[in-house]
Structure formats: C-alpha cells, structure tokens
Regions:
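Short phosphate-engaging motifs
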Residues: 5, 31, 92
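Extracellular/periplasmic periplasmic-binding protein-like sensory domains
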Residues: 10-87, 150-152
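A conserved active-site cap/scaffold subdomain adjacent to cofactor or substrate pockets
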Residues: 1-7
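Segments of small-molecule ligand-sensing domains
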Residues: 73-87, 94-149
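Residue-level structural signal for beta-strand termini and adjacent loop
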Residues: 155-156
C-alpha cells in the first residue's frame, strides 16, 4: 500500500533538521496502522503525525458497529490486528451485503447502485449514513498517534 512511500518520506523529512518538527498529515488510504508500525520499526519518532479517516475509531466500543467488528474479528481472525483499514472494509461489506439482500430479481449494476443509494441511515448502529456525493460515509475523522494509540482530534475543549 501507500504507507511505505509515506513512511519513507516522513523518515527522510524527520532526518532533516529543518523538517524534524513538522506536523505530517496522512490521508485515509495510507493505512495509519501500518505506517506507524513501519516508522516504529525504523526507529523514527511518531510524534507530530495526524491521520484522516472516513471511519470512527475501531476501538470506540460505545459504537455498536465497533463492538460487532471486534467480536467478529476475534471469532474469525483471532490473530489479526484490528485497524482502520479492516474496520472500513467491515463497514463497506455490511453496506454491500445489505444492498444485495434488498435487490429483487436479477442483480444488475443499475439495481445495485439504486439500492446502495437507499441504504438505511441507521444500518451501521451508531455510524450515520447518508448518500450524497456518491458516498455514504460523509464525515472525516482526524487522529493523532500518541502514547501508542490513535486519539481522535475534536473541536471540543
């Protein structure tokens, strides 16, 4: 994935005296979990890293969809690490399976797209869905990596 070149860029930048304290922001497709692990393996400081995600924290068990994700991962993949990428894939799979199950008759591209556009807002138990701009997840979450965990950055004081 793109985390390796991103990690290499951050490594080289942090080795430069003029850039070592710069704040870096990685976009969600860059796999935050793998990037942090790569930087830690390279013995690079993981301070001043911000990650954007289209999903909430995979550790926030106050959200029912997170509880379900964690339960199923432990059951079927007990040795796998939890992460943003697998959580996003889990949510996407739930949406897709729901859409396919609501199609009557033959499954066609047109029917699938129409059904995806009418996904119930509450399907993901605590994660709001609304179809607009050709997507269902419309919130962006920002996290910083601190004390070996991802902490959500919020506007709240």
């Amino acid at each position: 994935g793109s985390y390796k070149p991103n990690s290499l860029f951050i490594k080289r930048a942090k080795e430069n005296e003029n850039l070592k304290d710069v704040i870096f922001c990685n976009i969600s497709f860059g796999d935050a979990n793998s990037m942090v692990k790569e930087l830690e393996n390279l013995k690079i400081d993981t301070q001043n890293l911000i990650f954007s995600q289209v999903v909430s924290s995979y550790t926030n068990t106050s959200i029912k969809a997170v509880q379900e994700y964690q339960t199923l991962m432990k059951k079927y993949f007990p040795n796998a690490e939890l992460g943003f990428l697998s959580f996003e894939a889990f949510l996407s799979s739930k949406i897709l399976v729901n859409a396919i199950s609501r199609i009557t008759g033959d499954i066609t591209r047109e029917k699938l797209l129409l059904t995806l556009k009418t996904t119930p807002n509450n399907l993901l138990d605590g994660i709001p869905l609304e179809y607009k701009n050709s997507q269902l997840l419309n919130k962006t979450y920002l996290f910083e990596y601190k004390n070996r965990q991802f902490i959500e950055l919020t506007n709240e004081k």
